[in-house]
């Protein structure tokens, strides 16, 4: 994922969290929703429309591996990217559809919220929020919190893509 994901806002609060402080980070996850200021990046078959499956941390979470599917022409392709923790101790960086700098903003046993800034090969910057869960759709309250966070991050509130029921890639 990441991130593009990724990996991957804050649907549930605004405190920054550290990946190594959250053992619930690792494991099986599914993309619940994505928001982006450049909506074309997350539209159906868009380059940053990621269907996350798993997150693992190595070396004390200095490396975060995100396994996800991308879908092109109806075909799901499995991909794994590795993000490397940066000097600030919060941001991870990886190369996927350009350069990604992302942070875990919120972690619970049910959801993860990531903020990502992607700069593609044409130097176009995209701000994204990735919300991961266990396969459930967002509640009304979660959507409200997410749109508030998106606005704070410069992402239009209407640019929400809910993917919980659109994910047809293998488990």
Curated annotation (Swiss-Prot):
One of its GO terms (molecular function) is small molecule binding. May form a heterodimer with OBP1A. The N-terminus may be blocked. Its main location: secreted. Keywords: Disulfide bond, Olfaction, Secreted, Sensory transduction, Signal, Transport. Residues 1-19 form the signal peptide. It is found in: Secreted. Disulfide bonds join 57-61, 76-169. This is Odorant-binding protein 1b. InterPro entries: Calycin, Lipocalin, Lipocln_cytosolic_FA-bd_dom, OBP-like. Belongs to the calycin superfamily. Lipocalin family. Expressed in nasal mucosa (at protein level). Specifically detected in septal and lateral nasal glands. It comes from the Eukaryota. One of its GO terms (biological process) is sensory perception of smell. One of its GO terms (cellular component) is extracellular region. It comes from Mus musculus. Binds the chemical odorant 2-isobutyl-3-methoxypyrazine.
